[in-house]
Amino acid sequence: MQIRVLGCSGSIAAGSRTTSFLVDDNVLIDAGTGVGDLTLDEMTVIDHIFVTHSHLDHVLAIGLLADSVTRARRARNRPPIRVHALAPTLAALRSHVFNGVIWPDFTRLPDVQAPVLALVPIEIGQVV
């Protein structure tokens, strides 16, 4: 297993990136500003994002990532990126981020049958 630290700071000062870890090229743990340092090809192969909690420094790049990779994932016939989190965290994302006001609802785009994101509830102690 390879873990690449993309960010581990709570700020965006010069040289700092907010929390995000890339595991084996296709799994993100949190989606802070460090995700922006990945190439489009690196972003396109991310299949899972595990979100520890809904603070902006941990979820900020989910929408940006989804927007960036929609065409490339569709061209490669990739499944939706699965965003795994506790139900309250997913509810916060749906209500406050992917609501059509702050950011488009990528669980319904580019279309309902083939969205770029899928929100997947997990429970404490669950093995995924």
Across the structure, where does each feature detected by a protein language model lie?
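Binuclear metal-dependent hydrolase catalytic cores
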Residues: M1-V128
